[in-house]
Amino acid sequence: MRVIGLTGGIATGKSTFAALLRARGAPVVDADALARAAVEPGTPALAEIARTFGAEVLRPDGALDRKALGARVFADPGARRRLEAITHPAVRLAMREETARLAAQGHPLAFYDTPLLYEVGLEALLDAVVVVWAPRDVQRERLMRRDGLGGAEADARLAAQLPVDEKAARADFVVENAGAPEALAGKADRLLADLRGGRGRRLPNAPPVRY
């Protein structure tokens, strides 16, 4: 089974596109949900986090206190690397297990929906990457309208992310979503046809396939 990464930027329409893929019978796995499950109470990863960072990163019920952990690692690159050394292998194991489950069901391909695909280095585990892209001014306008933000707030949120143009430059497939949402349906059909037909990683120095 082929494993395809699906990512994008804030307000580019990735979630809408993921829903279109699901509606067409393609499994779309929420990679963030896998990451949360990997550090649930009773998991080896959570036990290692507590040993590394102390019991203060746990809530009274034994669950991970994400706010407390975030405060520990936000401004400390060394602490962040120690955390990633624990969580990344756990997430990769969860991905392999989910991939095996879907393959056993006979699916020829599956998508992993993850906003931070490039930021956490997941592309090495994937057969291809799809980026849902929109111009920055469109992202900004959508973000302001969707979340009721002012321009400065929207700009700050966009600045906190890896630019979607950079993600698109690294992708194998780019789904352009600057227009009306209904235009995405045909693009989902074309992407699935290409992937089911065997299209995958682009050649070095070749541009991504754009829809």
From Swiss-Prot:
Classification via SUPFAM superfamilies: P-loop containing nucleoside triphosphate hydrolases (SSF52540)
Annotated keywords: ATP-binding, Coenzyme A biosynthesis, Cytoplasm, Kinase, Nucleotide-binding, Transferase
One MF annotation (Gene Ontology) recorded for this entry: ATP binding
Record-annotated DPCK domain positions: 3-206
InterPro entries: Depp_CoAkinase (IPR001977), P-loop_NTPase (IPR027417)
The species this protein was found in: Anaeromyxobacter dehalogenans (strain 2CP-C)
EC number: 2.7.1.24
Reactions performed catalytically: 3'-dephospho-CoA + ATP = ADP + CoA + H(+)
Assigned GO CC terms: cytoplasm
Function per UniProt: Catalyzes the phosphorylation of the 3'-hydroxyl group of dephosphocoenzyme A to form coenzyme A.
Main location: cytoplasm
Protein name (database record): Dephospho-CoA kinase
Family, as annotated: Belongs to the CoaE family.
Superkingdom, taxonomy of origin: Bacteria
UniProt pathway: Cofactor biosynthesis; coenzyme A biosynthesis; CoA from (R)-pantothenate: step 5/5
Binding site for ATP: 11-16
